[in-house]
Amino acid sequence: MSVDNRRSTRKAVTGDPAPREIRRRPKNRRAQIAATSAAAFGSLGYHGVSMEDIATALGISSAALYRHYPSKYALFQEELLRVGSAMTEAVRLPADLADAPPRARLEHVLEALISTTIENRPTVTLVRWEGRYLAPDDLALLNGQQMTVLRALGTQVAALRPELAETDVRVLCVAILSAVTSIADHHAALPVKTIQRLLTSAATAIAAVELPPAVAAELPAPVEIPDSFKHELLLRKAVELFHARGYPNVSVEEIATAAGLSAASAVYRFYRGKSDLLAAAFRRAADRVSGAVGPAVAASTDSADALETLIRQYVAGSFAERALTFVYYTEFQHVPAEERTVLRNIQRLSVEEWARLVRDVRPELSSAETRFLVHAAFAQVVDLGRAFDTDPAGSPERVCLLMRAILFGS
C-alpha cells in the first residue's frame, strides 16, 4: 500500500473531513462556452439545443451559464457574428502587400480565410446553415459580413483576371467561398497544413475557370402530381415548406393545408409524422446520388469519363429539385436517429465512390484528400443555387465547370 493510500484509509477510519475542493472559474470561460455551444448547435441545430444541454456539456450549472449569457439566442448570435467578423478581418489585405502582384495578393487572402475557417470550423457550420434563425437585424449584419468577404475576394480575382465581367467575378468568388467553407459540411479529418494546401489549390483552380456565356438553362417543368397521389404530394409540399421556413417552424397542419388535406390527421394515413416526411425526403436525395454511381461507371470508358457523367447527373438532379437539395444540407439533425445512421452510411459510401474516381484521375492525392474535394464539389451546387437562384450566371453548365475544376484540378 502506498503512502497516499494509507492516508486516505486513516481519514476514512477516523472520520477526518476530506479537504474541500476549490473550483476556480477558468479565465477563458466565455471562450469555452462559445466553443461548446458552437459544437452543439452545429451538431443538433439551434432549435435542438437548450441552455441546460450546453451547461451540462461544460460541467457547470445552468445558473452559472446564465451569468455569462442571458439566453440561448444571445450565445448563438454572439458566436455567429464573432466568426463573421473574423472572416472579414481575414480577407483584409495588409498595407505592405498593396503593391504585390495580383496572384500573391489572392494567395495571401485565401491563406488567411482558410486558416480562419479551419480554426472556427464548428461555427462556420452555423454561419452556413443556421444563420437564417437570427433576428432580422442580426441576419442583416451576418449577410453584410459575408458580402464583405465576397467583395474582398472579388477585388483580388478581378485584379488577377481584369477581362472578367463583374457578374462572372462574383460567380467565381461565391464558388471559392463555397469550397473553403465546405469543410464545415462534414467531419473528415486531415492535418491543418494539408487542408490549407488542398483548399488553396482548389480555390486557385476555381479562380482560373473560363466561364461560358451565361445562358438560361432549359430545366424540365416540375411533374404535376395527381391529387390521388397524396403521399407524393405531401412529400413535395413538406420539402417546399422546410426549405422556405426551416423544419422546426413548420407544422403538420401547415403541410396538410398545402397538400389540400382537410385536417392534419389525414397526414397520418400516409406518414407517421413530420419527421417521417423529412426522413423520406432524405432517403430520396441520398438514393438519387448513390444510385447513379454504378450505371455511370459501367457505361464509361475510364474513371475520368465516369466522373464527368456523375458531375452532369448530380447537377441536373440537384437543379431539378432545388428545395430538396437545400433541405438535405440544412435539416439533417432533425432526421430521426435511426434514419440518420442509415443515411450517413449511404452518404459515406457515395462520397467514397466519387473519391475513388478522383484518386484514379489524380493519384498524387490521398483518399482523405479526395474526400475533402468531393464535399467541396457537392457544395458548389447548393451555394451557387442559393446565391443566384434561376439567374443564368449560376447555370448548370457553369456549376459543372466549377465542380470539374475542384475535382480534376487546374
Indicate residue ranges for each PLM-predicted region:
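Helix-turn-helix
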Residues: 32, 36, 40-78, 245-276, ...
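Hydrophobic alpha-helical connector segments
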Residues: 93-119, 295-322
